[in-house]
């Protein structure tokens, strides 16, 4: 067995998944990446390598701040609840993280500040005043993701303000065509603000060398070359208050842009792990001259940040760069984008309520490769492939032989192994399967394994132990045939252990033997196994249908909760909250104001005045002329004969159109939304308002 791990030096690896954003649930799109990374990590551990597998919630930014407000809680409360939910989902899919943390942590604050200050010290940070989009209704600067419009590069509509999902380009939100605030829908206005920039162009030579190292995926390297040719730009790393995140050291009301401290979250999570253990050294893994290996698994939508900004930030602040960034595509369901209305936008928790997580792990593995290809979760194919491969070909191999071993031979395998050539063929496949796992060609590895399963079942079919069992004097032959079948099953499950850890654990209990990569070199002989129990259940199409219906219900409940929160927030935004009560005054101050009932004798528009109406008011034996800016709210003729309230002792004011001898009282924010005060029936002109 040439690829025996005992023949190679032990590797030390730090592996990460992209940090899920802490404002929503994990769904099957997220799970592609986490399953892909977990399979690779489990394979490395199976080969005897030391792996630290870490992740965290990406917990900063305006979206989190606004959603927390919508939910009526603090951002800290919301991200704490989301973290619990995320970790439960990942555990449900057997994602074997060594540590799961949050970017909103002391470790991350310290590391983000340290990296920023080092970059500043080394001359890679500058500041300048920029014109930035500002929401005039919400009175806030708009983060990139809260401006939507048409991409300036490819002209795709409904794109975010920082990068285009259609063409992958990044740009400034001010470059968007027809921008709109995603918060209020208002057209943003430009407003000046001082911002801080990371000088990415200074790292172009280093990044080109890193790209040419040959370790990056071809598609990633080609995309980076396009970015080099179009020219690297300085990167805006700051955001203005209000913002949920870390304040920039030494600056007031300036915060780190979420994409600065998010990847530093990899370091923060590992630092948190190091602080909890005494066998890990943070510097050993992150020093510039580190001999350990660092790998990031990410989706294709965040390549720009991980292949340009992140290695440049690390290099500029004295840390090591990643060995590689493994990029995957998106998940579609039944050939289309995941849809909430169709029930194909499936949350991880909803899946776990209806189906075995190992089914999805196997199916994703069977379709994954090392390229940046989208993966389609075809639910019909999903059912057929899992049932055919896992149940019919692999698990059935054990059930076809285990019964005879248990009933006829007290659970003991044969002392002699009678098919060494066949077994050696299975063992020889280990090197090829190992290469495919290492290269993340999981689909090809699965095809190698299922091809071996076909050979194992062919052997059992040809030997027909159910026929031999009925023949006199054939007990030894029966035991030997079934022992071969059990041993071939053992090899197959060893190869599948990174993909299906729970099934592998049940197999180990059945075989009474740990499955190890080097262990397959020799078959089990004269070995006692336990009584066979069902190891794996078929997928029932009814469960998939139930999952789809539950996903539709999830979407409806989510929409109802959102509408309820919005209604609650709208109710909370009272007139009083929008226009707070003025400072207290003494009673004597109020007593100076003489309010009287007035009858509107006449009312007419003022020529060449957009807002004014001219009133003649009877205030009880005395006529007053008053001008009032309520023209947008009333037709003059509709007011004649009505009673209202007027400030009678207001000093007369000379206006362009005449003398105004008082003030009519009206309520409202202005414009069309104004209502004059009217007394109840019985009030007479000249009466004092007490």
Swiss-Prot record:
Residues 589-690 form the tRNA-binding domain. The keyword Ligase applies. A motif ('HIGH' region) lies at residues 20-30. GO terms for cellular component: cytosol. It catalyses: tRNA(Met) + L-methionine + ATP = L-methionyl-tRNA(Met) + AMP + diphosphate. InterPro entries: aa-tRNA-synth_I_CS, Anticodon_Met, Met-tRNA-synth_bsu_C, Met-tRNA_ligase_1, Met-tRNA_synth, Methionyl/Leucyl_tRNA_Synth, MetRS_core, MetRS_Zn. It is found in: Cytoplasm. Binds 1 zinc ion per subunit. One of its GO terms (molecular function) is tRNA binding. Its EC number is 6.1.1.10. Pfam families: Anticodon_3 (PF19303), tRNA-synt_1g (PF09334), tRNA_bind (PF01588). Homodimer. Belongs to the class-I aminoacyl-tRNA synthetase family. MetG type 1 subfamily. NCBIfam families: metG, metG_C_term, PRK00133.1. HAMAP family: Met_tRNA_synth_type1. This is Methionine--tRNA ligase. The gene is metG.
């Amino acid at each position: 067995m040439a690829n025996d791990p005992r023949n190679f030096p032990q590797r030390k690896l730090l592996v990460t998944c992209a940090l899920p954003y802490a404002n929503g649930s994990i769904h099957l799109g997220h799970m592609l990446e986490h399953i892909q990374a977990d399979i690779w990590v489990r394979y490395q551990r199976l080969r005897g390598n030391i792996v630290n597998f870490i992740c965290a919630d990406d917990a900063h930014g305006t979206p989190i701040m606004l959603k927390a407000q919508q939910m009526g809680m603090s951002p800290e409360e919301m991200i704490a609840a989301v973290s619990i939910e995320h970790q439960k989902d990942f555990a449900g899919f057997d994602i074997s993280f060594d540590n799961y943390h949050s970017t909103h942590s002391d470790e991350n604050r310290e590391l983000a500040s340290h990296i920023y200050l080092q970059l500043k010290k080394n001359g890679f940070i500058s500041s300048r005043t920029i014109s930035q989009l500002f929401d005039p209704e919400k009175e806030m600067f708009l983060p990139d993701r809260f401006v939507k419009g048409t991409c300036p590069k490819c002209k795709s509509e409904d794109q975010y303000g920082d990068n285009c999902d259609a063409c992958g380009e990044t740009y400034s939100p001010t470059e968007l065509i027809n921008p709109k605030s995603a918060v209020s829908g208002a057209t943003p206005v430009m407003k000046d603000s001082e911002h801080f920039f990371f000088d990415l162009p200074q790292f172009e030579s280093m990044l080109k060398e890193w790209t040419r190292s040959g370790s990056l995926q071809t598609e990633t390297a080609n995309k980076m070359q396009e970015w080099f040719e179009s020219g690297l730009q300085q990167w805006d790393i700051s955001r203005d208050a209000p913002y949920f995140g870390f304040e920039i050291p030494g600056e007031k009301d300036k915060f780190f842009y979420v994409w600065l401290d998010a990847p530093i979250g990899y370091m923060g999570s590992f630092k948190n792990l190091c602080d909890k253990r005494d066998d890990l050294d943070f510097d050993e893994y992150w020093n510039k001259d580190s001999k350990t290996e660092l790998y990031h698994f990410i989706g294709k939508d965040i390549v720009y940040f991980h292949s340009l900004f992140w290695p440049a930030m690390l290099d500029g602040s004295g840390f090591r760069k990643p060995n590689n960034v493994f990029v995957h595509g998106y998940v579609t369901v039944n050939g289309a984008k995941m849809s909430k209305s169709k029930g194909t936008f499936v949350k991880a928790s909803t899946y776990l309520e209806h189906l075995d997580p190992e089914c999805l792990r196997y199916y994703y593995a069977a379709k994954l490769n090392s390229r940046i290809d989208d993966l389609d979760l075809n639910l019909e194919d999903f059912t057929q492939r899992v049932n055919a491969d896992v149940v019919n070909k692999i698990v059935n191999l054990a059930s076809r032989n285990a019964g005879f071993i248990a009933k006829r031979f007290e659970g003991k395998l044969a002392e002699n192994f009678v098919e060494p050539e066949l077994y050696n063929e299975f063992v020889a496949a280990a090197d090829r399967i190992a290469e495919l796992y290492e290269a993340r060609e999981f689909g090809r590895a699965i095809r190698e394994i299922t091809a071996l399963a076909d050979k194992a079942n062919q052997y059992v079919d040809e030997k027909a132990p159910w026929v031999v069992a009925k023949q006199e004097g054939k007990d030894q032959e029966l035991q030997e045939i079934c022992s071969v079948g059990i041993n071939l099953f053992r090899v197959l499950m060893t190869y599948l252990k990174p993909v299906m850890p729970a099934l592998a654990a049940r197999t180990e209990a059945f075989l009474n033997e740990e499955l190890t990569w080097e262990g397959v070199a020799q078959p089990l002989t004269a070995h006692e196994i336990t009584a066979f129990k069902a190891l794996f259940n078929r997928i029932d199409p009814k469960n998939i249908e139930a999952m789809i219906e539950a996903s539709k219900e999830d979407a409806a409940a989510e929409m109802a909760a959102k509408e309820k929160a919005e209604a609650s927030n709208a109710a909370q935004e009272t007139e009083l909250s929008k226009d707070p009560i003025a400072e207290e005054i003494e009673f004597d101050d109020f007593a100076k104001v003489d309010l009287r009932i007035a009858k509107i004798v006449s009312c007419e528009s003022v020529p060449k005045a957009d807002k004014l109406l001219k009133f003649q008011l009877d205030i009880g034996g005395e006529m007053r002329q008053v001008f009032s800016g309520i023209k947008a709210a009333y037709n003059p003729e509709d007011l004649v004969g009505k009673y209202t309230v007027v400030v009678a002792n207001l000093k007369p004011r000379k206006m362009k159109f005449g003398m105004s001898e008082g003030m009519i009282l009206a309520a409202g924010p202005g414009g069309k939304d104004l209502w004059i005060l009217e007394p109840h029936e019985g009030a007479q002109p000249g009466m004092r308002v007490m």
